[in-house]
Amino acid sequence: MLDLSYYAKTDEIIEHYGPKPASLIPIMQDIQAEYRYLPGELLTYVASKIGVTEAKAYSVATFYENFSFEPKGKYVIKVCDGTACHVRKSMPVKEALMKELGLSNKKHTTDDMLFTVETVSCLGACGLAPTLTVNDEVHPKMTPEKAIDLLNELRGETV
């Protein structure tokens, strides 16, 4: 069960957009931006407040790839595996990140909630391959070594 402050913040977000069905997506976006994921309890709550069925709210949330029902780390690292990045060895970059962070195909977020590593189909920066993003900031021409250096830089920011 979520703390009451989650519901208070959600009420503020709903009030900002107006309690109407057309506000569903921007409300969900703001909730996810606030908590780094979309808590299922809040999605049910939002549905009841704006007049959509719970099924409708969940169908929208699961349709769009950017919504997540699992908490993500402070730094979301997306490793591109599009054709250009793949042939330029993006997967060794991802493997180095996963190994360094103690992650696996089933575990994408570190226990300290600092890092989440995901694979995406294309970041649209093919000329800079292989690329990854950290919180949507593009990092071009990555190597496993550069990726580890980047992790260490990010770790330094959190001290």
Task: Name each model-derived stretch.
Residues 1-159:
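Signature of N-terminal electron-transfer/Fe-S-associated modules in redox systems
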